[in-house]
Amino acid sequence: MSRVLVTGAYGFLGRYVVRELLAHGYEVVAFGRKRDKLEALRADGAEAAELFVGDFCRQEDITAAAKGVDFVIHAGALSTVWGKRSDFMETNVRGTQRVIRACKQNKVERLVFVSSPSIYAGKCDRLNIRETDCDASNCLNYYIESKILAEKVLREQRGVPCVIIRPRGLFGVGDSSIIPRLIKANRRSGIPLFRGGHNLVDITCVENAALALRLAVESEAAVGQVYNITNGEPQEFRA
């Protein structure tokens, strides 16, 4: 069975990706910077995963981790809206360049990159968004800018077949970000409901995003493509 390296393996999405791959017979190398969090991942349904402690911003780490690997899912990123531009560029852009270099050196069959639909964000409503509806000059924040630049790096490189996945608004068991923060804020002071809360949001069950990433590994037709991933069930924000 094929061997897959997953960066960002102990992140919210990464944990589900590791378990999804293991459940379908893949050998998985779970890559991350903190051994204790990788060990916690292994204890939480990923017993068969091989652990690799490292930083994909260090070329020697990611190159060593990719040795003998058939596929790489690059889910690791600096994914906050706060911070210095230099940190986003180092992690999300130059880090991705190092992952690509590691894939080339190890002759990896395919790289699946986890991007973000945040790149579509603007100061107006966006509905029925297609994968091509991206403004390459969008600099609304450093995270968005870094993801756009990382995608540009992937499109312009040669030698590593790539797939780009943009999963929207993940939720599920183990989420410590979007939904818990909204609940906490609402309990503390209430959340302002613009347009009475009738504005639409599209969120995605994390299991569906993990499935999409596995299918991106398996499908030859996916190579060179970009995919928005959502549940396809827009809901009013107040719901």
Model-derived features with residue positions:
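Flexible, glycine-rich beta-alpha linker
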Residues: 121, 160-181
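Alpha-helical substrate-binding/gating segment
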Residues: 183-191, 199-235
